[in-house]
């Protein structure tokens, strides 16, 4: 009996992408990563006169061995194993394939590095880094935008994609709240600091009118009057980070990590931090307790005469 109902690899990948978008409600970036990983596998199999539909466990293992030989990091290979497993599990459940060749596929162990965290003064300094009002209206608008975005990244712990996707109607300055569309299209309401309220208000009053394209509800824009993309935000954060903290790699996720760690160090309940971050599982949030514990030990070793 044939493994595949009448669908070729491209059709399978399109159907799987639809499943990820419509049923699992994953972000476009995550779906693109799945497609890239699976297309690499499909290309490898085609050279071996096989296909996604006719792949065997042995061929999948050969593909992963090739990835290792090519020098891919363990984390990248582990991600590809996850994509392959998800694809074949879906294909069998959906009736596209009769068997799952990835069932016994092992995932390489990945060292779980603790996230990079800034000191409170460093994070606050970064949020306040954009220069004061410039003579040029556009440059003044950019500085106001950057300050508002940085306050949301550190002051509210938003993901870079969540900041990029913000619309004006999701900001409630009177209540100091923002309605965030997170992973899996899940909404959560997050408080924003007084600093963020002031920064966003200034940007809305002075900066955004200078940058916004007509009839767009997006909150942030780039200098070309297009919505401020994830790539734009990463570049902006790295630029300020390189100026204020030379030699340190600072990303939007660094600010999110710092937000979570500083809350826990201040005594916040881990379940509350989980809700603020939008984590589906508290286990994801618990990694920040390890960071806090490490910093506690470092403080002890620095300060105690018997350490």
Regions found by a protein language model. Name each.
Residues 1-307:
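Conserved catalytic core of the tyrosine transesterase superfamily
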């Amino acid at each position: 009996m044939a493994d595949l109902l009448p669908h070729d690899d491209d059709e399978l990948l399109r159907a799987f992408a639809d499943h990820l978008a419509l049923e699992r409600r994953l972000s476009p970036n995550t779906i693109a990563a799945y497609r890239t990983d699976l297309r690499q596998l499909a290309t490898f199999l085609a050279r071996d006169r096989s296909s996604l539909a006719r792949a065997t466990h042995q061929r999948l293992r050969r593909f992963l061995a090739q990835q290792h030989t090519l020098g891919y990091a363990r984390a990248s290979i582990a991600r590809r194993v996850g994509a392959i497993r998800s694809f074949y599990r879906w294909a069998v459940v959906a009736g596209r394939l009769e068997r799952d060749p990835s069932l016994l596929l092992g995932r390489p162990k990945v060292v779980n590095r603790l996230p990079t965290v800034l000191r409170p003064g460093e994070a606050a300094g970064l949020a306040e880094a954009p220069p004061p009002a410039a003579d040029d209206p556009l440059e003044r608008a950019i500085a106001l935008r950057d300050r508002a975005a940085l306050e949301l990244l550190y002051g509210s712990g938003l993901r870079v994609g969540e900041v990029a996707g913000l619309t004006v109607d999701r900001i409630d300055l009177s209540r100091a709240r923002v309605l965030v569309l997170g992973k899996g299209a899940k909404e959560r309401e997050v408080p924003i600091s007084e600093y963020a309220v002031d920064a966003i208000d200034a940007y809305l009053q002075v900066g955004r009118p200078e940058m916004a394209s007509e009839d767009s509800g997006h909150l942030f824009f780039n200098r070309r009057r297009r919505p401020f993309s994830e790539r734009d935000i990463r570049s902006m954060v790295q630029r300020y980070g390189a100026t204020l903290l030379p030699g340190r790699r600072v990303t939007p996720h660094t600010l999110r990590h710092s937000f979570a760690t500083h809350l826990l160090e201040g005594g916040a309940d881990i379940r509350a931090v989980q809700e603020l971050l939008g984590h589906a599982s508290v286990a994801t949030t618990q990694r920040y307790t390890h960071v806090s514990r490490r910093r506690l030990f470092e403080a002890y070793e620095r300060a105690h005469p018997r350490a």
